[in-house]
């Protein structure tokens, strides 16, 4: 029942230099963020990565979960990491791997990636006993070529989501019209 198994990808050689982009995506969310917002944001990021690869470039994608023990922005920016800081980076797609949208979508758009996977890491590391409510969303240490920061607000319109993808592609110098 998986239509993706019927797709065969044909790779073609291109005569222009391929760029490799490192995308660091924070999956730190405030407890007030709805699952709908997480899913929409993940879909936007998946669309961006798909467009980069469609244009003939490569993407390395890293999920980042950074949390601070304290709520103030000073601590959430990583200024006093020895006071209470947990950060986990998971490479979910290496640049030389083909794009597997199902795996990418789970890691970037499914609330369980944070709530089950990352929270279980926090429990194993003892962080959940140290910080209240698993801590507060914080800024990643390593930001790559694109850093998609933690979320504190709600949904955006579909038009705004499309504009965001196009703006990010433009910042990277990725032109879809030549592909």
Regions found by a protein language model. Give the residues of each.
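Proteins with a high burden of low-complexity, intrinsically disordered sequence enriched in S/T/G/P/A and R
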Residues: 1-3, 37, 56
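MIDAS-like acidic motif and immediate structural context at the N-terminus
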Residues: 16-41
